[in-house]
Amino acid sequence: MDALNEVVKESMVGDCTHMSVLEVFKGVTHNQAIEKPIANSLSSYEILHHMIIWQDIFLKNIKDEPTDWEEANRIANEELTQTAKEMLSQKTWDQLVEDFTRSFDEAKTLLDTIDLSKPMETFPYGNKPTLKMYFVLNQHNSYHMGQIIKNRVAQGTWPL
């Protein structure tokens, strides 16, 4: 594996930073996940659901699979209009965490073989190297991880 690929993989799991993105889900109960402890905010369930949608879209791009970005935005926005309780009829919190972890692990595994300098033809902002999508993935996950931590602080379940 290329040294750059290794550094990107390490960044995904929190090497030399505070923690892995997966740490934020530890110990969260189903009821805590659907609660909105902060006025006018999303529940942790809704945030994780959003993270999965976009992580899967980012993975499609990394694998150079065709992506309809307008459709992806439409779906992501429609999903956010559902309430956490409506979403719960589809998946439990534990299933969501498993889905996120599976997709996250796939992104890490792809780093074993992928050329990060290879241009992505499916990227919406021009012909950028695959490395750019990994930066977007890490930034997106980090931002929303912070939102979940904020919810957990408000619930009194953070720090662990």
What are these regions (language model features)?
Residues 2, 15, 56, 64, ...:
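Acidic-enriched, low-complexity/disordered segments with a strong bias for Aspartate over Glutamate
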Residues 80-121, 131-137:
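Acidic/histidine-rich alpha-helical segments that form the ligand environment
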Residues 1-12, 85-95:
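Short, charged, low-complexity loops and linkers
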Residues 5-18, 22-25, 31-80, 122-160:
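Short, contiguous alpha-helical
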Residues 28-31, 110, 114-117, 151:
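A short secondary-structure junction motif
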